[in-house]
From Swiss-Prot:
GO terms for cellular component: extracellular region. Expressed by the venom gland. Belongs to the short scorpion toxin superfamily. Potassium channel inhibitor family. Alpha-KTx 23 subfamily. This is U10-hottentoxin-Hj3a. It is found in: Secreted. The keyword Lipoprotein does not apply. Keywords: Disulfide bond, Ion channel impairing toxin, Neurotoxin, Potassium channel impairing toxin, Secreted, Signal, Toxin. Residues 1-22 form the signal peptide. Disulfide bonds join 28-46, 33-59, 37-61. May block potassium channels. The record marks 45 as: Basic residue of the functional dyad. It comes from Hottentotta judaicus (Black scorpion).
């Protein structure tokens, strides 16, 4: 029972560290982005847009 409690506490600590340090909401896959924009006869580019404490990696077609 104690081992299970220790594992649960460690999991919560690690989860908290990831939430604090890595606040990335979405990831942009450049090849997929370029392919999607190519269908619209545009060029695709991954851009970073910060909003409050979260960073968004979005696909933009130009």
């Amino acid at each position: 029972m104690q081992k299970l409690l220790i594992i649960l506490i460690l999991f919560c600590i690690l989860k908290f560290n990831v939430d604090v340090e890595g606040r990335t909401a979405t990831m942009c896959d450049l090849p997929e982005c370029q392919e999607r924009c190519k269908r619209q006869n545009k060029k695709g580019k991954c851009v970073i847009e910060p909003e409050m404490n979260i960073v968004y990696h979005l696909c933009k077609c130009y």
